[in-house]
């Protein structure tokens, strides 16, 4: 659910207007231009149910996210890997794939950081070990990330 939430906040405006480039706004016309926002291409890997079902039927499930990174990742992209322990094999494999492609990788984990702490370009470790508490602390972190991205890309 967190992945869906974050992707949604990036695809649409998060906290303030995101003006469309003038050339795009003109092509869209007034109605669309006034009701759409500057957008960022953000994908939630767990939401691709059709792919996931096919992959886990035919291949080793813990590599599904890494396969998606290979399919969709391109230079300049950032992979945000979220795992309370930092040791979720599916997330670790996805980060390794992202690193191999030259993507930036950010981990969002609990206190220890687990395996992600050593393989992500940046690992944000919240000060908790209890899973529900880690998840609660992740919310303000990813809202802050969304705000910083929006402020930077849509001044």
Role assignments for model-derived ranges:
Residues 1-4, 62-65, 87-94, 116:
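Short glycine/serine/threonine-rich phosphate/pyrophosphate-binding segments
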Residues 1-72:
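Glycine-rich, small/polar surface segments that engage phosphate groups of diverse ligands
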Residues 46, 83, 109, 124-132:
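Short beta->alpha connector loops at strand-helix junctions that form conserved
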Residues 71, 132-155:
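A charged, well-structured terminal subsegment
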Residues 79, 105, 123-125:
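Short, well-ordered beta-strand core segments
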Residues 107-120:
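Short, glycine/polar-rich helix-capping loops at beta-to-alpha or helix-loop-helix junctions
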